[in-house]
Amino acid sequence: MNNKTSSGIFFIVLLCIITPPLFAENFHGIQAHGLADFRYIRTDSDNQNNTDFSKFSEGGANRDLFHVNEAALTLQGRLGWSWTGSITAKYGHNAKNPVDISEAVLFFKPVSTSPWRVNARLGSFYAPISLENTSTAWTSPYTLTSSAINSWVGEELKTFGGEATVGYHLENGDHVDFFGAGFGNNDTAGTLLAFRGWRMHDYEATILDGFKLPNPAHIQSIFTRQSLTTQPFAEVDGRAGYYAGFNLERPDAVKFRTLYYDNRANPTVVENGQYGWHTRFVSAGLKVILPFQLTLIEQSMLGNTQMGGLVGNHAAIDVNFWAHSLLLSKKIIEGHRISVRYDIFGTHKNDEIVQNPNAENSHAWTANYNWTLFTHHQFNFEVTTSTSDVTARTLQTINPSQHETLWQIGYRVFF
């Protein structure tokens, strides 16, 4: 881990350690909540060797797995009238570190006596992109498998910095919020999209996490300074990134949110095997509460990522990426919910390095039924099927077009 990366993470951890004593006189105790997630998984694929470029984390043909998928613990405490703190530790199946910090945040939310509201947060947290992953420890109340967009957010996007929001609230509860953030430690965002493509799962990277690259020998034959693993929250150039957007909401009716993100990474910088990836995108989401206890959620993302110096008219790697998802969920009776989601996503190669194919066109369906008992116990039955065309599969002599199915039975206990 390089010095810039470790300095940023050290600041976040130090913040969480020293803050409670500083506010000790006003500290009102700690609340703890979390979850444990147990999973049975079966995968089916056209090719049993289709693992590196599978659309699922547990790729391959005819695999049966039972494991503890995830465990999370969140501690929250009020640090005064306007300040609260929160830190989440996670265990994740296949994680680089068995237990690590997922989020560590200080919230500032002063009481307002006018329609104008100001709040802020400082630390390590997710940018306000997802409208689905709103439950405990960034899980979804609708499905086990996240959408392609939210899967990538969980893998490679996390804010290490500060965010401020200014909102105007009407008496009926309607409000508009404008937000912006500055951050570091996100210079490698885009690595997985370009080298591997999109993937659908429910894994959220922790702050010291890392991912093995697909077909690493081939990647290193072209980019000799690239590490065998990518660190999703590395700082390589010392330049801050930013995002900005707005949110429109009528509570319990409709919510619209959009933002523009730019990590401002220098694509020509390499440090400790980690390249800077200049990644920019626009994200938009709409959530509508419909009659008959129906919920509709649409999310879209369109962006570009670049790495390396110019080769011809483009950066060494220059990839456009896009994704859309549409989820419809219905609460049948108390404690019972069914959800269906369609995802379509892909990447387009702009660069001129023919030895590095990285184009993709894919789509997927997810159907989920969950049953919640006594608030704390939830059973999920889910199937996700994906049809994908990924040109990078040809590097492993695999047909670029693959059909995969993921069956899951999940038991979650919340506390």
Task: Identify the function of each model-found stretch.
Residues 1-10:
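Bacterial N-terminal signal peptides that target proteins for export
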Residues 14-62, 186-191, 195-219, 232, ...:
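Outer-membrane beta-barrel biogenesis signature
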Residues 19-20, 127, 290:
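Hydrophobic alpha-helix-in-membranes signature
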Residues 108-120, 156-326:
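Signature for the C-terminal beta-barrel architecture of outer-membrane proteins
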